[in-house]
A protein has these predicted regions:
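The feature marks the mature, well-folded catalytic cores of soluble enzymes
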Residues: 1-213
Length: 213
């Protein structure tokens, strides 16, 4: 340490009243400043976690649609049903994490185009409190797939839905942080012009969530 820097740090320490606190003391003090999260969490005791997620995700504000399947192997059929319902070509850009599924009858690619009509991705989890999806970037779950498709089909494991935001990230400090971590809450939209909600302004116009399990 340079003598100039040492002098500065010593002066700061003296001004603060002596020795610097240990990391444990600092952590304990910080935790004492954080209120119990339950104080600010919305109560929905009459609903199960998944029922709350369904209600929020399909609300008028978020405008997502839902399908439920029993197994991850059923995802391609759920996607085919969505294509048929919306008159779409059976073609999609999919996350590499889903490439091993049987996509017979659907033309797939793991590369995504700027004008992609349909993208199919795998969510890391969900949050019942807000109806949000959690996406972590990785080679198997590239982030652009969540934003470039006009129709975004997101695959979500039922057991990965947390009740509250805090629960979704409890213990996250033990995991390696991804390069990008995104929370997606409903379809893309803006109400900047005349307070009219325009869907698809900055991303997917349609969000379809396939819940597995």
């Amino acid at each position: 340490m340079s003598s100039a820097r040492e002098r500065i740090l010593n002066r700061i320490s003296e001004a603060r009243g002596g020795a610097t606190k240990s990391p444990g003391e600092i952590l304990a003090e910080a935790q004492g400043l954080i209120p119990d999260s339950a104080i600010s969490q919305p109560a929905f005791h009459q609903q199960t976690t998944i029922d709350r997620f369904f209600e929020k995700a399909t609300s008028e504000r978020l405008t997502a649609t839902l399908a439920e399947v029993g197994d991850i192997a059923d995802v391609p059929q759920a996607a085919a049903d969505y294509f048929a319902e919306h008159g779409l070509a059976h073609r999609a850009a999919i996350a590499p994490a889903l490439a091993s599924l049987d996509w017979t009858g659907t033309e797939i690619t793991t590369a995504i185009d700027a004008n992609q009509e349909v993208s199919i991705t795998l969510a890391d989890g969900g949050i019942a409190e807000t109806g949000s999806l959690i996406f972590r970037s990785s080679p198997d779950t590239p982030m652009l797939h969540n934003y470039l498709g006009l129709h975004h089909i997101a695959v979500l494991r039922r057991e990965s839905v947390a009740r509250y935001l805090e629960e979704a990230f409890a213990g996250a400090e033990d995991d390696a942080m991804p390069r990008i971590l995104s929370l997606v809450t409903g379809t893309s939209g803006t109400a900047d012009i005349e307070a009219v909600n325009i869907r698809g302004a900055h991303g997917p116009r349609y969000l379809h969530i396939v819940v597995v399990g």
